[in-house]
Amino acid sequence: FIEMLPDSNVLRKIHADKVEDLDVAAMLDKINERITYLYDREHTIGHAFFTGLQGEHATLENLKHIFEKSIIPLLQEYFYEDYQKIQLVLGDNAKSSDELKFILDEKIVARNVFKGSIEAVIDLPEKRYTINKAALEDIRSYKEIL
């Protein structure tokens, strides 16, 4: 067995490292640095997800598809739907506006959801999380991961 960790240089070598003016390889490195910090290096995102972004296929639409169908679901699995950590990995905590966040959070007020006393119930969620489809279609959302 030979360990094969993600290698963003592969993307550079095969010219799959740019979508518009986004440095895909640098974005992958930043995502993996955060995953390593929050989880471990064995769960980093492989460069193979992005190798199809070559030539005419280096489009925002293809990048969106990779994130929507592969990267975000993988992060949901890795972090057991701990969306705060997913937000950290994707840089949503530091985005210049909410419209660029991949994961939106909305405060939930329990008394607006339930009738009667709920004090006896512990660990009620304080936020509801949703995937922001519009952010997936905006190149700035990906740039602000960096």
Give residue ranges: language-model regions.
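C-terminal regulatory/interaction module of P-loop NTP-utilizing enzymes
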Residues: 1-146
